[in-house]
């Protein structure tokens, strides 16, 4: 280590490095080796929950635990400390006469943040706290930096997001939130696996952005000297697998969109897309409700979910409403009536709904009305279906009214949680939709996509009637952990 670097260290860091050197002099590796424990903190608490101090003493049971040293007190020949593992904390009670002088020195010189292994007798203190009375201490790893001053509840938001490891050490609530996230994803997998779906993996690097209306990240493949994009959706590759006969597939994975950041948006996020052959959007509506209710039940139990003080009846059947009916109910405007684009624009002007340059069809105006007036009213789980063809380039037209598609979005607390439809499997219709998207792109719609001719070719080999679904995992995790910002459910959110 250079003198220059040593001068950058504070007193605590210097002392910790000196202790590291002292351990080496004693023949102890400061960064340890494999250590076998017999239980974690919670397993011990569960196992001995019903035994008092005397009963534990009579049982004379032993255990071996390991964890990070997070508290330490005592002096002379006796010390108390707490070790923290994945499940929580447990107290250790160390006596010099029980572990020996040399072993006691290891404990005595251990700093907060160090990892220790402890073998000993399971006991309960006079205060009733389950503890391990040490018979041997093993040094497992040296922490060369002290934990932050207020590590029992890190509060600096910048540090929480940039140094998530410190947040996880210090904030049990945060730690449990990410455990819950993991469980939600596991339960979604379990639900779909039990229904015969296959989990698959599709490329992250695409030649053409597609499957969603979003601006992509662009990168360059040096060996082939071609520009590529990070995927904005997994849709088109998953539907190729339906063409290939896989019938029921899903993928949980990262999606990348080169767009703004706010409380519910991060440039990279996790979604699940699900495709089922021989199904339509009504079947997928049932599937979506089942997935979300199963995930909610697994982490919140059978009842409703409380989100920021609002009771969300996630355990009850979700409301289902056509987009046009929802608009009519709130604004009085009836888009079931046939009208020209100019007539629709006039109604928009009257209602002060902004009209963009690329709004070339009545369907664009209908969607703008929905976003302006309806979205903010959708608190309880609501399936809004019947989106206009103009804003649904991959969805099948409704056979009874060709202006609209067999598509739905799920809204909860005014936010979209899922998007699904009966998939468009007519390659000729699909090509014309792609061409309309390409035209919108030329008119300034930077979320419109180009034409994926390879996907058109796949459809020409025949795709069965199919229902498809996309759910934003991060937003679902926010809902089920009562979190207001997406950064609190992403272990490593995007930072400047």
Curated annotation (Swiss-Prot):
SS bond list: none
Cofactor(s) required, per the database record: Mg(2+)
Chain positions recorded as Mg(2+) 1 binding sites: 409, 416
UniProt entry tagged with the keyword Ligase: yes
Example of a GO biological process term: lysyl-tRNA aminoacylation
Superkingdom field: Bacteria
Molecular functions per Gene Ontology: ATP binding; catalytic activity, acting on a protein; lysine-tRNA ligase activity; magnesium ion binding; transferase activity; tRNA binding
One GO CC term, this protein: cytosol
Coiled coil regions in record: none
UniProt key word Iron-sulfur: no
Subcellular location per the Swiss-Prot or TrEMBL entry: Cytoplasm
Catalysis: reaction(s): tRNA(Lys) + L-lysine + ATP = L-lysyl-tRNA(Lys) + AMP + diphosphate
Record note on cofactor: Binds 3 Mg(2+) ions per subunit.
Alphabetized SUPFAM superfamilies for the sequence: Class II aaRS and biotin synthetases (SSF55681), Nucleic acid-binding proteins (SSF50249)
Residues where Mg(2+) 2 binds: 416
Catalytic class of the enzyme: ligase
NCBIfam families: lysS_bact, PRK00484.1
Entry's family note: Belongs to the class-II aminoacyl-tRNA synthetase family.
Oligomeric form and interacting partners: Homodimer.
Name listed for the protein in its UniProt record: Lysine--tRNA ligase
